[in-house]
Amino acid sequence: MIIKKKESFKSPGRLWRVTKIRKLTAAKKNELQNRKCNQASNEEKKILYKSNFLDRFIPSKANSDAFRIMENAFTEKLNTQESLLPDILNLNVKGVLHYKDNKKQKTTRLIESTNYQRQTIHGASSSLVIEVEENGHLSNMQGSLYETPLRILDAPGLLDDFYISPLAWSTNGELAVALAQNVYLWSEISGPSIMELSPTTYEVSSLAYSSDGGFLAIARVNGFVEIWNRKTKNNRCDYKFHHDGDISCMAWSPINWTLLVGGSTGNIYVYRRTKSMMRRVHTIKKVHQEQVCGLEWNYDGTQFASGGNDNLVCIFDIDSLENKKFYWIHLAAVKALAFCPWQKSLLAVGTGSNDQQIYFYDTFRGHRIHSLFCGAQVTSVIWSRRYKEFCYSLGYSPEGTNSSLIVYRWPQLTKVFDIPSAAIDGWGQDLRTIMAIHTHRKYSNNTWEEGEYVVVANSDETVKFYKIWGNEMQEIHNDRVLYREGIFGSHILEMLENIPEQVLTNGVR
């Protein structure tokens, strides 16, 4: 099938670039309406309106303050070289990725409070206070434990752009956040710090940690990718590469130092690091006719998926990069991709605002297994390692959305709970989730620990931590994951080819 390449229209500034114009026909409108009626649960149903909007950067508060600075500065300056960088570069880092901890004594659970005021052009806004009782429960909790962010980091300069990947989590417990041209690091032990990057006017568009947390890849809108060594105390840039156009996504292999880089021209660049060097080993040309928006590996590094602004999702086997194994065409751009960590061939694909669906595919046989209507742009999908569940984050919706994250059971596709948007400064329904990531940890024997938190980047310039898959309230969750299994619960059936589609579909219901 030949996909006609669409023209690109540009207006001043990258974030206002329009990559495609889509109009809904009457047939398309009816199709979306039918999906809503057929797939909405008996719970609270969402209403889908006609959408002529795009996925890229849809600002809703054009006249609001662009950079908010918290009144609280660091109480103590770090005695490291990194702490001198803001003075050298004339940067103001007060309040960036910072919070106050008002935990009560004798509290055993790790729940931080965000008791601060944010100074804006309209004055100080009301503070968000989460009190902690000695039994570890939230005393002023609105709804369940899961609905309240347990930590909020202020992130002035966080770009509201569907096509960027501003968060990365190291398996060593370090969070990297892209704020305009800079990269900030945060950990529970050392707090926030700024990386000593070369001065530039180009924004950071993507971040990615290697599976061991030893290397951090930083990409910018001008096509440069830097590989920073995080194994040494003195951060250093080991390698630097350039590509045509901006970079929206990158992904490290879970088993080695192989890095995928998605370009704006539709190419996927494959890099591999050895003990002495890192070099490009392959270029997969014209995988997509437009920008590559998402890249994702399966858990053993034998397959990866790519999603593009041309609505295409492609599957590659690592030992056969010349040819796509499968590809599927959708009705909107695809950024959200997630392989299941306990069902090797199960892939979740989240689409943009013109489709608003999550599709589930078998990447061994190429079949579509299920689909789920979400009612908004899907910006991320995350699988639990502890329970047979997944969650997804919501971006732009024509009607607005009150939810930031929604958790579902697999394969029942019934909702466990949703997390309402916790907006700062009264964003309300205009609040969007740009990206969400897990906080899993990996050990030397290739075993994983379930991350207690899901970290989300919101359009109100905050980074929030939600505790979703902890050990509390296990009765509301689905079955626990006891071992890695196939789609049918069998490794043998997982490896069989040419299983009839009807059998495949019925096998997961």
Swiss-Prot record:
InterPro entries in the cross-refs: Cdc20/Fizzy, WD40/YVTN_repeat-like_dom_sf, WD40_CDC20-Fz, WD40_repeat_dom_sf, WD40_rpt
Q: Which UniProt keywords apply?
A: Meiosis, Nucleus, Repeat, WD repeat
Where found?
A: Nucleus
* PROSITE patterns noted in UniProt: WD_REPEATS_2, WD_REPEATS_REGION
WD repeats: from-to residues: 159-196, 199-238, 242-281, 287-326, 329-371, 437-477
Q: Does the keyword Ribosomal protein apply?
A: no
- SUPFAM superfamilies named among the record's database cross-references: WD40 repeat-like
Coiled-coil annotated spans: none
Per its UniProt record, what Gene3D superfamilies does this chain match?
Answer: YVTN repeat-like/Quinoprotein amine dehydrogenase
Its function, per the record, reads: Has a role in meiosis.
Q: Which family does it belong to?
A: Belongs to the WD repeat CDC20/Fizzy family.
In Swiss-Prot or TrEMBL terms, this protein is called Meiotic fizzy-related protein 2
